[in-house]
């Protein structure tokens, strides 16, 4: 089941989302846009289970990482509009 994982440029490179992910979807990659010189990346979105632990772990007020659940998941959860 494919979910979309978006990482925004408000990421501070803290690695909290990477550590929170139970399926190792995320990893840190070099990036000059923040003090930590790294940003989260989601190279393995096919393994995402949609638990949103990465979102919960994000310490920024902007939720620098967002998981958008696939259509099949939202339908089975009764979230389809």
Swiss-Prot record:
EC class: oxidoreductase
Superkingdom of the source species: Eukaryota
Positions annotated to bind [4Fe-4S] cluster 2: 21, 48, 51, 54
MF GO annotations: 4 iron, 4 sulfur cluster binding; electron transfer activity; metal ion binding; oxidoreductase activity
Ligand binding ([4Fe-4S] cluster 1): 11, 14, 17, 58
Entry's cofactor comment: Binds 2 [4Fe-4S] clusters. Cluster 2 is most probably the spectroscopically characterized electron acceptor FA and cluster 1 is most probably FB.
Reactions performed catalytically: reduced [plastocyanin] + hnu + oxidized [2Fe-2S]-[ferredoxin] = oxidized [plastocyanin] + reduced [2Fe-2S]-[ferredoxin]
Topology versus the membrane: Peripheral membrane protein
Subcellular location(s) of the protein: Plastid, Cyanelle thylakoid membrane
InterPro entries: 4Fe4S_Fe-S-bd, 4Fe4S_Fe_S_CS, PSI_iron-sulfur_center, PSI_PsaC
Main location: plastid
4Fe-4S ferredoxin-type domain mapped to chain residues: 2-31, 39-68
Alphabetically ordered keywords of this record: 4Fe-4S, Cyanelle, Electron transport, Iron, Iron-sulfur, Membrane, Metal-binding, Oxidoreductase, Photosynthesis, Photosystem I, Plastid, Repeat, Thylakoid, Transport
Gene Ontology biological process terms, A to Z: photosynthetic electron transport in photosystem I
EC number: 1.97.1.12
PROSITE patterns: 4FE4S_FER_1 (PS00198), 4FE4S_FER_2 (PS51379)
Cofactor(s) of this protein: [4Fe-4S] cluster
GO cellular component, one term: cyanelle thylakoid membrane
Subunit structure: The eukaryotic PSI reaction center is composed of at least 11 subunits.
NCBIfam families tied to this protein: PS_I_psaC
Free-text function comment from the UniProt entry: Apoprotein for the two 4Fe-4S centers FA and FB of photosystem I (PSI); essential for photochemical activity. FB is the terminal electron acceptor of PSI, donating electrons to ferredoxin. The C-terminus interacts with PsaA/B/D and helps assemble the protein into the PSI complex. Required for binding of PsaD and PsaE to PSI. PSI is a cytochrome c6-ferredoxin oxidoreductase, converting photonic excitation into a charge separation, which transfers an electron from the donor P700 chlorophyll pair to the spectroscopically characterized acceptors A0, A1, FX, FA and FB in turn.
Name of this chain's protein: Photosystem I iron-sulfur center
Gene name of this polypeptide: psaC
């Amino acid at each position: 089941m494919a979910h979309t994982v978006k990482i925004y440029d408000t990421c501070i490179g803290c690695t909290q989302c990477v550590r929170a992910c139970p399926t190792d979807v995320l990893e840190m990659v070099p990036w000059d846009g923040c003090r930590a010189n790294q940003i989260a990346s989601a190279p393995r979105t096919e393994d995402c289970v949609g638990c949103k632990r990465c979102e919960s772990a994000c310490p920024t007020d902007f939720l620098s990482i967002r998981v958008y659940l696939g259509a099949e998941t939202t339908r089975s959860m009764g979230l389809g509009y």
